[in-house]
Design a protein with these regions (language model features):
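Bacterial Sec-dependent N-terminal signal peptides
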Residues: 1-21
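Contiguous, structured surface segment used for ligand recognition
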Residues: 18-110
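Acidic/histidine-rich, surface-exposed loop or edge segments in extracytoplasmic proteins
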Residues: 52-55, 117-121, 193, 531-535, ...
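Second-shell loop/turn segments in exported
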Residues: 57-62, 122-127, 199-200
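Catalytic-core regions of glycoside hydrolase
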Residues: 83, 87-97, 116-120, 141, ...
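Active-site-adjacent substrate/metal-binding segments within catalytic domains
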Residues: 110-132, 140
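C-terminal substrate/ligand-recognition segments
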Residues: 502-525, 537-560
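Extended, compositionally biased alpha-helical segments that mediate assembly or anchoring
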Residues: 643-739
């Protein structure tokens, strides 16, 4: 009987699914791959994975499915020369896998590996379906993530809660934000922008979150669900009689109100929230809350009591639950957390590679770190999902291998994913590498793993990159990559594209140009190598953007020197470079606007929904908000992208209009002005005033008036790449070399 049951179980596994989630993952990488591995899950108090050999099969052993998946990834990189990343999550494995000749074991005491920033869910994941989420969870498992933030569908919880509190569907629609802006609603920054959401959206996201949570748990991950810290609609005082604090504005947006955790009705509202959350998505061992996010200290708030009230509300759901909180600017406020019990709070040191708070020098240094509370060393890396090569390799390694008392793990806290895979690969390996190493030694192995080949030119290109653009120095606190000149609103002093990048020059543009030259010099040899072609386009894109910044400076110098002929030539060259960038990026689906807008359109089930979601997608990456929020609030171009389609149809018209306005102004200065004969209205001006008038003047254009119409359009952008990456990269290099 036992044999029969075993036989039936084996048949069931082979017909319907594989017998463990890592085998399933291997099959998604390459059909038939699971037959080449032997997966062994064993009990251990230590987090580990082992690589071993048993006959023709590679053995991957570990104490959790995630750790085993990490071992699979290690083997694929360093034995098989296969690198899986966002641009390539499938690969053809060799018929016979390279043997593990000597057993290899990796252990770590950094047992928690976190993933995601609230912003990631809007800047990258706003319109993802299950198929895309499944790939992401595979990526997470392969890179050791076992503590992922899981906030998809939070709006479903809020809708149910608000209905029970007496809010109408129309009122709820004015409170909950649209798909591309949910993250900032969840962080208590804004209300309603991008909405109202249709009922089908709530149904879609509830189903999606349940699929996400099931897969995460199957892989031994511990999802971090959103907790409750007092957010209520701004009209909650009038509607519900709640004693709330007006949170004011956030970059021009009306913020939701705050029900103070010390209020007598806080427990009631929090209980209602957690009940609805549990009904939909179950209980969790970790809950995320970030009260008072990016807000000034309020003398009317007793932060210690507020923290205790939020903690108690969470503990009523699960007495063993841990509160996960971001270490960002003034948060978590010491007054709120100093009295909390060790183990009840887990702090994400959000920007550890640049602005660590855990006790080593930085502008955000806390002399005592987070005191008794455990925390995670996190890589922020990216803001706004901007496109650009960037990293802080030396800072990352130096900070990680410093004294980190109470550190329990690492975290990926990027605002946008699907960029700079080299930095995320490096970060994911740190828990498994107890001894400090150099970026130069590591990059050699990375390059061989990423492309599956050894090549001196490629290695030289990457050595240049890791010692220049991927090595932003300590003291430079810029937020994310060097922003492309193409993406900024034009002006005489254009430097950064967004309002808050804090960008500084820290590498020589000649370095990215030389790295691009080296990659292009061997491009024909690696035509068809997916990872190589992705990096070839990305590195050449960076070189072209860097050279275009110099071309811009030449053009503005022509204007200031009143050299009309050279101005016309240099302006035309700049615009030619911009259009070449558009063409280059069109050769890869990842860099096409269509992959973003089409996901938005596909999320809709009716023409009206498709229109709303596409508008959300277009606004987020351009104006971000209405005129006031874009201009006065400063949000315009925060999420700018060097993407095919966006360059040609959004950024190009801005620059063309600007250069035409400058040319017209130069022409006007050469025209006769008889009204000024004898001094005219200038007769009474001082010499200093006349001198200022004689200087080259800025032109004033209403950029928002140019930008908003594009956000309202519905012209299609395709996903499918156009042209050969190798051929178009060569054309881009030819253009770079001319200038």
């Amino acid at each position: 009987m036992k044999r029969l049951l075993l036989l039936l179980f084996t048949i069931h596994c082979s017909l319907f699914t594989f017998c463990n989630p890592v085998d399933d993952l291997l099959e998604r990488i390459d059909k038939g791959a699971s037959a080449k591995f032997k997966i062994e899950k064993v009990k251990s108090q230590t987090d580990f994975f082992e690589l071993d050999q048993q006959g023709k099969k590679v053995v991957v052993r570990g104490n959790t499915w995630v750790n085993i998946a990490s071992g699979v990834n290690w083997y694929l990189k360093y034995y098989a020369g296969i690198h899986l990343s966002w641009n390539q999550m499938q690969a053809k494995l060799p018929a016979t896998l390279p043997a593990v000749k000597t057993k290899e074991r990796h252990e770590t005491d950094l047992t928690l590996r976190y993933d995601f920033n609230y912003c990631t869910f809007s800047y990258s994941m706003a319109f993802w379906d299950w198929k895309r989420w499944e790939r992401e969870i595979d990526w997470m498992a392969l890179h050791g993530v076992n503590l992922p933030l899981a906030i998809v569908g939070e709006e479903c919880v809020w809708r149910n809660m608000l209905l029970k509190l007496g809010y109408s569907e129309e009122e709820i629609g004015k409170f909950i934000a649209g798909p591309a802006f949910l993250a900032w609603w969840e962080m208590n920054n804004l209300e309603g922008w991008g909405g109202p959401l249709p009922l089908s959206w709530y149904q879609r996201q509830e189903k999606l979150q349940k699929q996400i949570l099931a897969r995460m748990k199957q892989l031994d991950m511990h999802p971090v669900l959103p907790g409750y810290c007092g957010m209520v609609p701004h009209d909650a005082k009038a509607k519900l009689g709640l004693n709330v604090a007006d949170a004011g504005l956030w970059n021009g947006f009306q913020r939701p109100a705050n029900l103070l955790p010390t209020d007598s009705r806080f427990s009631e509202i929090a209980t209602l929230y957690y009940n609805e959350l549990t009904k939909l998505f179950g209980k969790a061992d970790y809950y995320s809350m970030d009260p008072f996010h990016e807000s000034n200290d309020d003398p009317n708030i007793d932060y210690a009591k507020a923290g205790d009230a939020m903690m108690q509300a969470m503990k009523r759901v699960n007495p063993k639950a841990v509160w996960v909180i971001q270490g960002w600017t003034e948060n978590p406020r010491p007054a709120m957390v100093d009295g909390m019990k060790t183990g009840d709070l887990l702090v994400l040191d959000l920007f550890s590679e640049c602005r660590p708070m855990f006790g080593i020098p930085s502008i955000w240094k806390r002399d005592e770190g987070y005191k008794q509370h455990p925390w995670l060393f996190c890589l922020l890396e990216n803001f706004g999902a901007n496109v650009g090569l960037h990293g802080r390799m030396d800072q990352l390694l130096d900070n990680f291998y410093s004294d980190k008392r109470n550190c329990q793990g690492i975290g990926f806290t990027m605002e946008g994913s699907e960029n700079n895979p080299v930095m995320f690969e490096l970060m994911s390996e740190l828990p498994w590498r107890p001894e400090k190493f150099t970026k130069e030694a590591w990059i050699k192995d990375y390059v061989e793993a990423r492309y599956g080949v050894e090549d001196a030119a490629i290695e030289q290109a990457w050595m240049i990159l890791v010692n220049s653009i991927y090595n932003c120095p300590a003291g430079n606190n810029q937020q994310g990559p060097h922003e492309s000149i193409f993406c900024g609103r034009p002006s005489l002093n254009n430097f950064q594209a967004s309002s808050w990048s804090k960008m500084k020059n820290y590498y020589d543009p000649a370095d990215t140009k030389e790295a691009a030259r080296l990659m292009n010099s061997v491009a024909e040899k690696y035509c068809g190598n997916n990872n190589f072609e992705y990096d070839l386009v990305d590195i050449t894109r960076q070189a072209l953007a860097d050279q275009a910044r110099q071309q811009y400076q030449h053009t503005i110098a022509d204007y200031k020197g009143f050299d009309r002929q050279r101005f016309d030539q240099d302006a035309a060259r700049f615009l030619e470079m911009l259009l070449m960038q558009d063409k280059l990026l069109g050769t890869r689906a990842e860099f096409r606007l269509g992959h973003w807008t089409q996901d938005a359109i596909n999320a809709g089930s009716s023409a009206a929904e498709k229109k709303l979601y596409e508008w959300n997608a277009r606004v987020q990456i351009t104006t971000w908000g209405n005129r006031y929020c874009a201009d006065t609030g400063g949000l315009r171009d925060y999420a700018h992208k060097e993407w095919q389609g966006l360059l040609k149809d959004f950024y190009y018209p801005r620059w063309k209009a600007y250069f035409e306005a400058l040319a017209a102004q130069m022409k006007a200065q050469t025209a006769p002005q008889p009204e000024l004969l004898g001094g005219g209205p200038n007769a009474t001006k001082t010499a200093a005033e006349l001198f200022q008038m004689a200087l080259p003047q800025e032109v004033k254009l209403d950029y928002y008036a140019m930008e908003e119409p594009w956000t309202l359009q519905q012209n299609p952008y395709t996903v499918a790449p156009e042209g050969s990456p190798v051929e178009v990269a060569r054309q881009a290099m030819d253009l770079i070399n001319i200038y």
